[in-house]
Amino acid sequence: MGTNDALTSTEDAVTAGANDAPLPAPPEPPRKARRATSRTSDFRVAEQPAFVLHSYPYRETSLIVDVLTRDHGRLALVAKGAKRPHSALRGVLQTFQPLLLSWSGKSEVRTLTGAEWVGGMLPLGGDGLLCGFYANELLVKFCAREDPQPPLFNHYVLTLTRLAHGEPAVQVLRSFERVLLRETGYAMALNRTVARRAVEPERRYVFDPERGVRNADDDVPSHWPVITGQTLLDMEQDDYHRAQTVAQSKTLMRFLLNTYLGGTPLATRQILIDLQNL
């Protein structure tokens, strides 16, 4: 995929040669100078693949930008002067577009020092745009700051690409939700029960948010949604061509997300429910 090529550029290789006659080793720099150099390199990051998740005003002319980066996880960056009319950052810090970001600092909010648009990704529109905002809100809610998750970053890129190409939103969102929960520490094995038995297509099950798949015949809370084994197996294979799987997977994921968020509502989820019942 062109986008992945742009977002996974490799580091330059550095080679060194040697003269026939050995040269004396250069003197070591003073201790103080070495420590200062280490601090500078540790607190600067250059051209990191990233996406803007959300931004909001900061003081009169700046923005706080919530970003998802490939190798550093989710970060907050202050974009100084980004609200000024002629700021070069105004047209670059857009959601759903691949960027290369540079920043410095070690505090909770770093300072953005550079932003470059990578390109190669179609813009989102219509339902795809709403789904993109929904994915962004989930990332903000579930991803702790400074917790690198390259597989989740890569699946986010895939999600945006699929939405931009008009793939069915239901399938794209369920796939993203599952990867998000898995990569943020919530077990999502759907083909085996907590008793280590294989899920059977014709049986009825529930998903215990703390443990996993259980038989629906067990003594379980009445508000847990009951789902068929076929739905669980379809979800495990990312297969949503059955109408029953579409309906039951939506109910299950809504239940799990609400549980893991402690009942905190998702603004974009309600919009999607109202408009498209996604």
Swiss-Prot record:
Swiss-Prot/TrEMBL keywords: DNA damage, DNA recombination, DNA repair
One Gene Ontology cellular component: bacterial nucleoid
Signal peptide feature range: none
Region of interest: Disordered: 1-41
Biological processes, Gene Ontology terms: DNA recombination; double-strand break repair
Keyword flag DNA repair: yes
Task of the protein: Involved in DNA repair and RecF pathway recombination.
Family according to the record: Belongs to the RecO family.
This protein's name: DNA repair protein RecO
